[in-house]
Each structure stands twice: as C-alpha cells, then as structure tokens.
A protein has these predicted regions:
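Ubiquitin-like/PB1-type beta-grasp interaction modules and other compact soluble beta-rich domains
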Residues: 1-79
Length: 81
C-alpha cells in the first residue's frame, strides 16, 4: 500500500489531503496516471508538467521507482518572492 499526500492546489481540487492506494505501481508517474483517471478534478489536479513529487520526503523525478510502503507527495512547483 502507498500513502499518497496532496498539497496546495492539488489538495484543494481533489478535496483530500491524503489517500491510501493499493496496487502494484512501478513509478510515481504510474501512480499519477492512475489517479488522474478518477475524474476531471483529479486529472486537473495531477496534470503532468505542473506537478512535483516527493518520495519518502525526497524530491524525485516522476519516473522514479516506488514500492509498497512508500509515501508519495504531489505538489505544484514552489516559487518565492
């Protein structure tokens, strides 16, 4: 099982801050694609190219491998000012 967290705009669009996800996913991108198929709000919240991912609290590329028990966090790019 994966623990999937959502922050900022993805959290607001989806209406959830976290979910438990069962299944066999090879990469964070596979998780993103699976969740984006849950509906229009999910697809908008998890739009490729507008999202960063952290696996076990480390910023990683979407193509990074995931395994059972991992924590995956999706969030928009952070800007400063």
């Amino acid at each position: 099982m994966l623990n999937v967290l959502f922050f900022a705009q993805p959290r607001e669009l989806i209406g959830e801050d976290s979910i438990q996800l069962e299944g066999d996913f090879a990469t964070a991108e596979a998780v993103r694609e699976h969740l984006a198929q849950k509906g229009d709000r999910w697809a908008l919240a998890l739009e490729k190219g507008k999202l960063l991912v952290a696996i076990n609290q480390t910023l990683m590329p979407l193509e990074s491998a995931v395994k059972n028990g991992d924590e995956i966090a999706f969030f928009p790019p952070v800007t400063g000012g």
